[in-house]
């Protein structure tokens, strides 16, 4: 686009070409728009510059999220996998884990720890990750396994199943906060990894969206508890339903609030203290 062309374009056309299509704008064209007597044209320029700043900041953020992956890529590794789980704290439903290997040039705009995203953003990113990943997998540990093993080790089982489900064998695994036992390849545990590694963040999004969809299905099979809304987490609505209806087959009977609803003594105690102790042992 030449500077002399700008004056012949309406403000609506400028918006379409520069904002909707993202056509490049050279220095001379920027200067021409800055001097354009039309306030609307100058506003288009302001928005172009704002988007440029945001894109630059997003690029820096994504590079920061890829620092663990970049170090491994520089060593010649290709299949760097990330894995994370969702659903450790709920009173009902399985633990679900996601795993993925991403292409080196993949930069999904807006990716973050799944807990920091709204549902629409998570679902958009999950579909984008599935389309672009070298490979991905979702797996779970069922309620019966949670009750038999305790939730920490059931979570480890779900993580391992997700990793084993990848069609490409990982050369290195990035894990959120813990180490998986007996893996045949190296791994790096990263505390708060879903906020510090792009690949773990992608895995967390796969896990969270898969579990949310499953809990919506289970809500139809077990009406009255509100599983589609609270996803099995210990909310006031969920406690009220437990009091009225008692426990259903997908409730974790080793969790204290469920056992109380059934008139049983607590069994697992402080599961997250147990999990922290196990992580400390791994370290």
Curated annotation (Swiss-Prot):
Enzyme Commission designation: 3.1.26.4
CDD domains hit by this protein: RNase_HII_bacteria_HII_like (cd07182)
One of the protein's GO biological processes: mismatch repair
UniProt-listed PROSITE patterns: RNASE_H_2
Domain RNase H type-2: 78-267
GO CC annotation terms, alphabetical: cytoplasm; ribonuclease H2 complex
Protein name: Ribonuclease HII
């Amino acid at each position: 686009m030449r500077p002399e062309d700008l004056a012949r374009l309406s403000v609506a056309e400028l918006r379409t070409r520069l904002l909707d299509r993202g056509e490049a704008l050279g220095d001379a064209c920027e200067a021409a728009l800055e001097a354009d007597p039309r306030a609307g044209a100058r506003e288009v320029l302001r928005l172009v510059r704002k988007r440029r700043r945001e894109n630059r900041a997003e690029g820096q953020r994504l590079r920061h999220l890829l620092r663990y992956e970049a170090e491994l890529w520089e060593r010649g590794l290709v299949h760097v996998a990330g894995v994370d789980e969702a659903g450790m704290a709920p009173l009902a439903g399985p633990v679900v884990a996601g795993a993925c290997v991403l292409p080196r040039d993949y930069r999904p705009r807006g990716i973050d720890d799944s807990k920091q995203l709204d549902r629409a953003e998570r679902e958009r990113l999950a579909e984008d990750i599935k389309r672009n990943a070298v490979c991905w997998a979702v797996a779970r540990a069922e309620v019966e396994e949670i009750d038999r093993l305790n939730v920490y080790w059931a979570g480890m089982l779900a993580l391992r199943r997700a990793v084993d489900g990848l069609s490409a064998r990982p050369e290195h695994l990035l894990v959120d906060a813990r180490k998986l036992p007996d893996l045949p390849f190296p791994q790096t545990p990263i505390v708060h990894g879903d906020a510090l590694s792009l690949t773990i963040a992608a895995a967390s999004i796969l896990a969270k969206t898969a579990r949310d969809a499953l809990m919506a299905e289970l809500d139809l099979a077990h009406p009255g508890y509100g599983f589609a809304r609270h996803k099995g987490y210990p909310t006031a609505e969920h406690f009220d339903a437990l009091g009225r209806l008692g426990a259903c087959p997908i409730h974790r009977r080793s969790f204290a609030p469920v056992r109380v609803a059934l008139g049983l003594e607590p069994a697992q105690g402080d599961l997250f203290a147990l999990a922290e102790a196990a992580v400390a042992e791994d370290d």
